[in-house]
Amino acid sequence: MEFDFAELPAQDRYRLLVSFVAPRPIALVTTVDAHGCNNAAPMSFFNVFSQEPPLVILGMQTRPDGTVKDTVANIKRSGEFVVHMVDMSIAQEMIVTGINFPSDIDEIEFAGLTSVPSVKVTPPRIKEAPCAMECRVAQTIDYERRTIVLGEVVQMHVRDECLDERGRYVRPEVYQPIARLHADNYIVADRQFVLKKPTDLLHHEEAAGYGERKPEKLPG
């Protein structure tokens, strides 16, 4: 099948994109409004973008009436936000924060989660999350119905048991983030497998200037 996106209705473009670009990690984003009220919202148009500089990217759509959502307004006003990864321990709470509450409702508190102070930004982080990344805005890109935010990670919090004793490697049996497939369908990252490049072809990388590749020692 072929699809000309110039001729395709927006809803059909959305359906195709999110159904095939999947699973997508969930970012539970916290911000603060001008009155000091906390806001939390989940989004699946999200990913890590770079490690140097350390960037994450968020894509946030307007409300059906075209007005800007609280998360976007708060980020543009303050230039700060916190991204939390989501696992099964806070999956139901994450869904609750996705309800379109009035702006004066603290979704963190309403969902039964605990807000604790961040280190380098004003918005709080969620204590129960397995991982939290404090971010400052690096760039925003505005479209008619969507805002793209690039955020630089300035501080990262990780639940102790998610890492090995050296704090270097993720323990996959412990950290199992959930991701969105499409509609109300989600998946858990609880199955991993190894795929390695053929060793007899690695000389091509050395010839291209990558140098000799030494296998990284894994924990255990």
Positions of predicted regions on the chain:
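Basic, polyanion-binding surface patches
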Residues: 1-220
